[in-house]
Each structure stands twice: as C-alpha cells, then as structure tokens.
Amino acid sequence: MVEDTASVAALYRSYLMPLGIDINIVGTGRDAIDSLKHRIPDLILLDLRLPDMTGMDVLHAVKASHPDVPIIFMTAHGSIDTAVEAMRHGSQDFLIKPCEADRLRVTVNNAIRKASKLKNDADSAGSQNYQGFIGSSQKMQQVYRTIDSAASSKASIFITGESGTGKEVCAEAIHAASRRGDKPFIAINCAAIPKDLIESELFGHVKGAFTGAATDRQGAAELADGGTLFLDELCEMDLDLQTKLLRFIQTGTFQKVGSSKMKSVDVRFVCATNRDPWKEVQEGRFREDLYYRLYVIPLHLPPLRERGEDVIEIAYSLLGYMSHEEGKNFVRFSQPVIDRFNEYEWPGNVRQLQNVLRNVVVLNNGKEITMEMLPPPLNQPFERKESVQPDLSELISVRDICPLWLTEKLAIEQAIKACDGNIPRAAGYLDVSPSTIYRKLQAWNEKEEKQKA
C-alpha cells in the first residue's frame, strides 16, 4: 500500500485484515519502487498524490520493470479523470477516497484472486492443469467433467473431501467457469469464525446491533450478490444458524443482525466439508432439509494418495514456483525422492505436499532435492504394510497350476490397479523397482502385438 497519510494507511490496513493478507505500507513513490527490489507483491494499492512524485510516475516505473503486478489507484473525487487515464496505462481499477471497508475488501479480494489465477496459469504452462488444479489422473478428469457440466447451472454444489484436497480451489474453479465468473466470489469458513460472530459475518449487522457494532456492516451474503457464496466447513455451523441459512436459500432474502428489514440477493451456493454430510444428518448435527437443499450436485475430491502420478506432477509445478519465489535454483528431484513421494500416503494431501516443499526450498540450496533435505516423516525409513500371504495349504490339481509369467503379470496388474495406476507406488508394495515393472509391461505389450500380427 502506497499511502503517505499514516492514519489513512492504518485505517485501510484494518479494513483489509479480515482477508488474512500480508500488507506492507510505504509513504513515498521512491520507497514503493525500491521495495520491488526485495519483494514482488501480489497487488499494489497506490495513492494518486504522493509527496515526492505522482502516482502516474510510480505506475510507469512499476509497469516498466514488473508489467504483471496489478495496481489499484486510490483517488479523491476531483482526480477521477486522472485515475481513468491511469487505467488506460495499465492500472487494474480505481477506488474513490474515502473508501468504505466493504468496497475496499471486495475490490482487493477480487484483484488478488484474479492475479493469483493468472500466475498459476503461467506457472503451470505445459502441465495438465485445469482452473487452478494440476493433474491428469482419471479421478481428477472426472472432477473436471463435473465442474464443466455443473458450472453454468445455478444448482447448489456440495464438495466433499479430506482436508488439504483443494476444496476452495474447486469452488473457485466452479465460479470461474460459471456465468458469474466476473462477479464476486465470497468465501466464509464456518469453522474458523466464533459461534457468536458467524451470523454477523454471513448476514451483516446494523449499527448498535451488539457491543462493538459501531457502524453498519455488509455480510458475506450481500457482498456475494450476483456471484458465488462459498460456505466452507458447512457441517460445523450451529443448528440455529442452519435454520436461518435454510430460509435464506429458500427465499433469497435475509435480515442483518439487529435489523427488521429484509434484503434480497441473488447468489449461487457452493459448500464444502471434510466430513460425511449424510452421517452428520443421521447423528443430528446437520439439518436434513438443509442437506437436501444444498446436496444437489455432489462433487468428491480424491485424496492425493489416490491420484497416481499427479503427485510428481504437482510437486514439479510447486518446485518451479517456489524456487522462483524464494530465489533458489532447484529444478529436479532425485529418484529416491520421487520414489518416496509416490510411496507416501500424504495424510495432509496437497496442502502437506506444499508445506514439505516450502520447507525444503527455504532451508536448502542446490539444483536437486535429495532425501537428506526432506523433513520428517518423509526422511525416515518407509514402513511397508505387511502383505497378505496366500494360503498354500490346500492341495490343487495340475490343471490349476498357472504359468509363472502369468501369475507375475496378474500380481503386477492387480497392484497397479490397487494403487490407482501409480506404478512407482505399486512397485514399492511389490518390493521391486519401478523400472522392473516398466520393463515387464513393455515386454508383455510387445508379446501381445506380435500375437496380433
């Protein structure tokens, strides 16, 4: 944020705190330009009038060296023409000062999300990526097909999946692919907000509604008008609020906390949970009528351990991005690391893989990620699950004896199927090297081709 008035900068920082973003404030144009030598921001909020140069001067300097960095101008009423001119030279948007909290939050939130999507698309060039996802496994292809089919509808979508599988990325993909893609995408985490505040976060409040409500405030429902409202960890919502949410879904209207007036909005509902929603209904923690209202199009995200060779594809994409961001030179993984990544169960899913790679890239140097660089438990001996021993006690006739090569072929095919096509992982369970399996598969394919000829 480039703002020379300290009180205004502090106020705007407080407005943006709920977004959970890191905000760096500088007071001059020169400081703003110099700061780019140390860190490239995801967004620049730029005051048009600065003590040492104009905002236009800063705009030209930033765009000359970092053309992809989005800039939003903050301007008083009298300089709107200049702000419009700035947009012609690369500014993404402008805000009129004094700026309301909700307007600032929505503008900044949308700008950062758009910039993040463009960055992800660029970083994933050449990879099998889809709307922020990376991976081409069969299970993810099914996810992509569901998103393509359901995005244009207004029907509610219920995303399920373990923590770290990318449920918010999925919700953003649905929004981006829908007719509402240019409208707000507002996310609210029902598990992260205290019970006594979540109604205000969802529906907003009026001045004096409760202690500390000094001004009127828009809630997520109103901010999402025309766009998508994403309710993350919905099964954590209190039953009383579930009743009000059901009424909102049925009528499209709601009341702010402390108000008797009804407000009407048009939103598309996408929700997510890491639990089994029907089990939550059966155990009385989730309303059955709300379940039927929202569970119109179910979409399940597979855990990373079931996504086959997507693991390495994602790892390489993250490695390239993180190495660039941290100023490192990593370009590849050693074969033992690749084998370990394929063998590992990844209980924390993609989020855990991100954290592992961030740890490795920040704390180490070089071009190749090796086993010694991995944090626990990945750098520890891999404990294989004990295999089930076949029962050889029963006598069989000679007619039941299967050729050894066919027994081997069936065992390998079953292992590959059980590991969702992940050959390195299947090799780990079979206690052979991946190259052995690749070689045998190739030999069997060649044999079949000769028989056909």
From Swiss-Prot:
Keyword Transport attributed: no
Pfam families xref list: HTH_8 (PF02954), Response_reg (PF00072), Sigma54_activat (PF00158)
InterPro entries: AAA+_ATPase, CheY-like_superfamily, Homeodomain-like_sf, HTH_Fis, P-loop_NTPase, QS_regulatory_LuxO, Sig_transdc_resp-reg_receiver, Sigma_54_int
Modified residues (4-aspartylphosphate): D47
SUPFAM superfamilies registered for this protein in UniProt: CheY-like, Homeodomain-like, P-loop containing nucleoside triphosphate hydrolases
Domain Response regulatory: 1-112
PANTHER family: PTS-DEPENDENT DIHYDROXYACETONE KINASE OPERON REGULATORY PROTEIN-RELATED (PTHR32071:SF117), TRANSCRIPTIONAL REGULATORY PROTEIN (PTHR32071)
Chain ranges of the Sigma-54 factor interaction domain: 133-362
Name recorded for this polypeptide: Regulatory protein LuxO
GO MF, any single term: ATP binding
Keywords from the UniProt entry: ATP-binding, DNA-binding, Nucleotide-binding, Phosphoprotein, Repressor, Transcription, Transcription regulation, Two-component regulatory system
Positions of ATP binding: 161-168, 224-233
One GO term (biological process): phosphorelay signal transduction system
Highest taxon above the source species: Bacteria
Functional summary from the UniProt entry: Involved in the regulation of different processes depending on the cell density. Acts together with sigma-54 to repress, perhaps indirectly, some genes.
